């Protein structure tokens, strides 16, 4: 997870009610992340369970998202940021998330699109907004978002609500967007900014757009009639 998605998670936590228990999939705090991935503190006082395929800091239980050892409809909220690119059979993982999530539950999920290979321990997939629409088609209300240029986003995310979750309003969507602008940051280091700036002058802006537009985003509130 990058700092930008941590900001999106904070914006979501301050805008929407996350029912308990909250299950974070991929909660291992990776060395060198500087605490960016520590989401537990965004939900004070709530029952929060961190699971990962490996033990370590931030992990309460070692579990595979492809076969969660949890009863049907037993989880209030699921958070899975920058996880499913590492899941070999990702469709099984999405099925497990939706199996264990209660009808009044909430899911926050993100996956990179334009991002380097990062093996934790393996890196298999990239996703588009349409992929989330397909994978989450059973969840009637969704906010689909993406970071960076429309054609080559850095990250793609979705906030999806179960059929009995309180109606997500356009006013909440507007507040969510406002807080994303406030919290979600991905500044470019000055050396890289100079290097990419020269490259943009020589090659055109297209190849470098994801980096110069990293703090731009778009999102859409979608409902199934």
Q: For each predicted feature, which ranges?
A:
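S-adenosyl-L-methionine-dependent methyltransferase catalytic module, highlighting the catalytic core
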Residues: 88-225
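Exposed alpha-helical structural elements
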Residues: 4-8, 38, 175
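Conserved SAM-binding loop
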Residues: 16-118, 128-130
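Class I SAM-dependent methyltransferase Rossmann-like catalytic core
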Residues: 1-16
